[in-house]
Amino acid sequence: SRRPARLSQPALEVLAIIAYYQPATRAYVDQIRGVDSSYTVSLLLERDLIEECGRLAVPGRPIQYRTTQTFLRSFGLSNLDELPELPNTTPEDGQLTLEMQAAVERLQAAQAAEGTEEVTEEELLQAAREMAQAEEEA
C-alpha cells in the first residue's frame, strides 16, 4: 500500500486547529490563521483526516468539521482525550503568531531531516505544545 504523503505546513496548521477546537468552521480556522483555508480544508477532507459534522446555527449555516478515525489512526491515538491539554484553548487574536508559525516550521524541518513520509504523534504533539505556549505568551 502507498504511504501517505507528508502534510504541508498549512495542512498541519489547519489539522491542529480542527483537532483542538473541533467542531470548527472554515471561517474559524481562517480567523485563527489569518488566511483563506478553503483549499487546505478540501485537501484534508480528501485525505479523510477531517469530516463534516453538521452546521452551525447562525446565518449562512456554515459547515462544521471534526477529525476522523483516520486522523486518530494516522497519529497512533485511540481517542481525542489522548491529545495533550493545551494551556490556553482560546486563541486571543485572528492570526497565528510568529512563534506558532516557527513551531510548525520546526515540525516540517524535523520531518524532512528524518525523511519520514508521515507526521509522528510526537511531532504533532510537540508542535501543538509549542503553538499553545506561543498563544499563552501572545
Which functions belong to the PLM regions below?
Residues 64-74:
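Basic, amphipathic "hinge/linker" alpha-helix immediately C-terminal to the N-terminal HTH DNA-binding motif
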